[in-house]
């Protein structure tokens, strides 16, 4: 990532020098007032976004998303207020950018040559590709010529110019558009067999697979491309330079790494059987215990407490292990006595004690650990003991890392099982690799509960407002959309 940012800065510096030779800045200033100065004068940064489960959304804990967190940090960097303006699709967003209604377009947008001719490129912070998806179990297409039906895509999608370009070499390629469904909803329609194919961005597909595991990737429609911000083409490049400076700062301070860890890391592991079992349990078992998770959640979201319990026992209050731990939260006898519970197989007693014990551990974590990361430290301590957590913090410091940065700490957890490392630590050997996987699993389970609930709520709303998909798809592909 650092190399990518450095190359972008060098490239843009050369570009700006060449542009200055051809078209003096004074002419630009006469044509339009400096966009960067406009932002500073109004003390507001206007960023256009599209509601999206990874980029921008309003959840139980407030506004969140990759683009939101980056934009919020950039506004703070400029010492201005952030004003989010939302649009239904990329087409509307770019229209607003062209009409000076927003200063930046940030919506998980991939680099496209066509767009780079119309707008300035702001910054790149991860990469992704467009992929064709189908339902697992049906015939897999390996290339465009093997599609046995139309692609269904949202109206105004950023993939439209790509499809139009691909059609030049694939004249039989056809697609239909719909105004009624988002890209995420179309992925779910594929999973349910209601439509044959759609196209999505690779990270979005990975996220969708954790709530509908029968979504499968047929093939890559494009190579990986940078995901970046777009800026008005007519603006003086001081805004562009500010964006690049900020992204370089965000990379050096670890902000980008922390955001990627938060939104992407749990997507790396995909186990079809495990996810199928988990989703079945969410529907059939979780409702029995949801009220208890809500009652004893403390400072946690109840979904997080539920995810911990699933990792511990798969929501089985009678679960046992050869090591002697028992119950929904798999408590040891000593912990049960310490938390004053009399029956470890009581779901309520176990959930209460597990939550109280986790909160107790989190209170003992140094205050220098950021609030948003304390839960991960607490979970590691819950799994392997507070002493070993303190050991891995010391080890992280010895190895030149930051003990208050979860990314630095978690990569050192497996080292607690290596003699050359644990022999010099106060609490000695620990199965740190298990603690590492324990935390990763809980993050994945937590995310799946959140997304499953959101999708279920959206589908209920759609069922109330809309009829079936085939009647709502607009067959415009061979006329206005593909000239």
From Swiss-Prot:
InterPro entries: Lysozyme-like_dom_sf, MltF, Solute-binding_3/MltF_N, Transglyc_AS, Transglycosylase_SLT_dom_1. Residues 19-267 are annotated as: Non-LT domain. GO terms for cellular component: cell outer membrane. Gene3D superfamilies: 1.10.530.10, Periplasmic binding protein-like II. One of its GO terms (biological process) is peptidoglycan catabolic process. It holds the Pfam family SLT. Transmembrane segments: none annotated. Residues 459-483 are annotated as: Disordered. Its EC number is 4.2.2.n1. Keywords: Cell outer membrane, Cell wall biogenesis/degradation, Lyase, Membrane, Signal. It is a peripheral membrane protein. The keyword Signal applies. CDD domains: MLTF-like, PBP2_YfhD_N. GO terms for molecular function: peptidoglycan lytic transglycosylase activity. Residues 269-483 are annotated as: LT domain. The N-terminal domain does not have lytic activity and probably modulates enzymatic activity. The C-terminal domain is the catalytic active domain. In the N-terminal section; belongs to the bacterial solute-binding protein 3 family. HAMAP family: MltF (MF_02016). Murein-degrading enzyme that degrades murein glycan strands and insoluble, high-molecular weight murein sacculi, with the concomitant formation of a 1,6-anhydromuramoyl product. Lytic transglycosylases (LTs) play an integral role in the metabolism of the peptidoglycan (PG) sacculus. Their lytic action creates space within the PG sacculus to allow for its expansion as well as for the insertion of various structures such as secretion systems and flagella. This is Membrane-bound lytic murein transglycosylase F. It comes from Actinobacillus pleuropneumoniae serotype 7 (strain AP76).
